[in-house]
């Protein structure tokens, strides 16, 4: 019997295979009930080019598990990725539905200039 987490991990693994075939940098997102995390990872998968999360001092003071926090993380990851020389990425939702906080983070990253 599959648990909810095992099903999500299986979906994520399947999507990552397609992203790896593209050979693009990937913007990966992880969410927990309390926090949001985002990383831009190199095509080979061995190097993190930029990262942002609600655990950082700048974002920790406000609410960390809602859409407002997700929007701030999306904006921050886009500015850090552009500073690292990354302009386009493949969006890796890590098996989460493209809805709610994941969607808000992606939209904020697009508005801040990241292409995907």
Swiss-Prot record:
PANTHER family: 39S RIBOSOMAL PROTEIN L18, MITOCHONDRIAL (PTHR12899), LARGE RIBOSOMAL SUBUNIT PROTEIN UL18M (PTHR12899:SF3)
Pfam families: Ribosomal_L18p
Gene3D superfamilies: 3.30.420.100
UniProt record similarity statement: Belongs to the universal ribosomal protein uL18 family.
Record's function text: This is one of the proteins that bind and probably mediate the attachment of the 5S RNA into the large ribosomal subunit, where it forms part of the central protuberance.
The protein's name: Large ribosomal subunit protein uL18
Subunit comment: Part of the 50S ribosomal subunit; part of the 5S rRNA/L5/L18/L25 subcomplex. Contacts the 5S and 23S rRNAs.
One GO MF term attached to the UniProt entry: 5S rRNA binding
Keyword rRNA-binding: yes
Entry GO CC: cytosolic large ribosomal subunit
The entry's keywords: Ribonucleoprotein, Ribosomal protein, RNA-binding, rRNA-binding
Chain segments annotated as transmembrane: none
Organism, as annotated: Marinomonas sp. (strain MWYL1)
InterPro entries the UniProt entry points to: Ribosomal_uL18_bac-type, Ribosomal_uL18_bac/euk
The UniProt record lists the keyword Endoplasmic reticulum: no
Taxonomic lineage of the native organism: Bacteria, Pseudomonadati, Pseudomonadota, Gammaproteobacteria, Oceanospirillales
Domain of life: Bacteria
GO BP, one annotated term: translation
């Amino acid at each position: 019997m599959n648990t909810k987490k095992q099903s999500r991990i299986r979906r994520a693994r399947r999507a990552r295979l397609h992203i790896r075939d593209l050979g693009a940098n990937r913007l990966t997102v992880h969410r927990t009930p309390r926090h949001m995390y985002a990383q831009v990872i190199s095509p080979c998968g061995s190097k993190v080019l930029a990262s942002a999360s609600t655990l950082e001092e700048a974002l920790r003071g406000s609410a960390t598990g809602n859409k407002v926090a997700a929007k701030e993380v999306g904006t921050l990851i886009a500015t850090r990725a552009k500073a690292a020389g990354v302009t386009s990425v493949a969006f890796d939702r890590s098996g989460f539905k493209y809805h709610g906080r994941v969607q808000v983070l992606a939209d904020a990253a697009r508005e801040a200039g990241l292409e995907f």
